[in-house]
């Protein structure tokens, strides 16, 4: 991975100038953001996220959701975002599969985007 690309993603995640901070010195929410950024910097075709906001306070929950939206809007990565909290569905997510125990899955295609 190019250093310039890594610095770009760190800046997008609010970590400009903190490239040399140790992982252990970061808060739990910051660690979660860095793990997502570490995956995003490689520009994968698909980024699979299982409960990326689980256990976070409201402030870092919103920061993570904003970060995920930035990644999705980059146009290079498709997010597969698994959550139990419907309020975490991002405005940019266009395909939603809703699962309920014992019921047929409900699939929605959102055509309007934001």
List each language-model region with its residue ranges:
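Conserved ABC ATPase signature
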Residues: 22-26
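Conserved catalytic motifs of ABC-family nucleotide-binding domains
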Residues: 43
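Catalytic Walker B motif of ABC-type/P-loop ATPase nucleotide-binding domains
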Residues: 47-51
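H-loop/switch region of ABC-family ATPase nucleotide-binding domains
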Residues: 82-84
């Amino acid at each position: 991975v190019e250093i310039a690309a890594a610095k770009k993603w760190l800046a997008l995640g609010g970590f400009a100038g903190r490239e040399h901070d140790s992982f252990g010195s970061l808060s739990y929410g910051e660690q979660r953001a860095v793990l997502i950024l570490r995956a995003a910097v490689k520009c994968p075709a698909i980024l699979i996220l299982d409960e990326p906001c689980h256990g976070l306070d409201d402030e870092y929950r919103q920061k993570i959701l904003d970060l995920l939206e930035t990644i999705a809007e980059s146009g290079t990565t498709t997010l597969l975002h698994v959550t139990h909290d419907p309020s975490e569905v991002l405005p940019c997510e266009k395909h939603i599969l809703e699962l309920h125990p014992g019921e047929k899955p409900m699939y929605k295609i959102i055509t309007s985007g934001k």
